[in-house]
Regions:
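Short gly/ser/thr-rich secondary-structure transition/capping motifs
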Residues: 17-23, 89-93, 140-143, 163-165
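Short glycine/serine/threonine-rich phosphate/pyrophosphate-binding segments
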Residues: 48-54, 75-79, 162-171
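Phosphate-binding/switch loop-helix module in NTP-utilizing enzymes
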Residues: 115-173
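Phosphate-binding loop that captures ATP/GTP phosphates
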Residues: 65-66, 71-121
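Conserved, well-folded catalytic cores of nucleic-acid-processing
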Residues: 36, 40, 62, 80-85, ...
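Extreme N-terminal, non-catalytic leader segments
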Residues: 1-46, 86-87
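Walker A/P-loop phosphate-binding motif and the immediately C-terminal alpha-helix
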Residues: 35-73
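Residue-level signature of catalytic and energy-coupling elements of molecular machines
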Residues: 33, 44, 70, 78, ...
Length: 173
């Protein structure tokens, strides 16, 4: 087995190419969205998801095309709040994953749509000693991929329901 010192460049993984490709895909998706709004708080349980769902509903009432990314991967609730359960089967097409349609036609992508049941935990790693930095890195990567892989189409607003903690906003820029 080669050690880190034995590798030249990226060791053949093309990691730089993969990161560039994800960035281009993400920019392409977000270019079709007029306004992106992240709703966040330093503390959990303060009503971010409820406020996000209500803002989306008000915008949809005014005729705007609205989507929500539930970026609270460990406590997703947007699907439930807007009428989408765990039984929804997401459809993958050539242009990406089709988001679920909630009340008022609000497009939704949420981790709870990917889990078997509402109380299924998200397991980032099998290792009991995984550090918070490692888990945070996996979370931010998952959020970027959900944004990039979801076929949002043209939207007036994309609301991003952030997880608790103010340290996460830099991870999705």
């Amino acid at each position: 087995m080669k050690t880190y010192e034995d590798l030249e460049g990226d060791g053949g993984s093309n990691i730089v190419g993969q990161v560039v490709q994800l960035g281009e895909k993400l920019r392409s998706r977000l270019d079709k969205i007029k306004h992106k709004v992240a709703l966040m708080s330093g503390k959990g349980g303060v009503g971010k998801s409820s406020i996000t769902a209500n803002i989306a509903s008000c915008l949809a009432d005014r005729g705007h095309k609205v989507g929500i990314l539930d970026a609270d991967l460990n406590g997703p609730s947007i699907g439930h709040l807007l009428g989408i359960g765990n039984d929804l089967k997401l459809e993958t097409k050539d242009d990406g994953i089709e988001p679920g349609d909630g009340y008022q036609g609000i497009k939704i992508m949420s981790m709870d749509m990917l889990l078997k049941t509402a109380d299924t935990p998200v397991m980032w790693t099998e290792e009991a000693d995984a550090t918070a930095v490692w888990v945070s890195t996996m979370e931010s990567t998952a959020i970027r991929e959900l944004l990039a892989d979801t076929n949002w189409g043209e939207l007036d607003y994309l609301l991003i329901d952030m997880p608790p903690g103010s340290d996460r906003i830099d991870n999705i820029r």
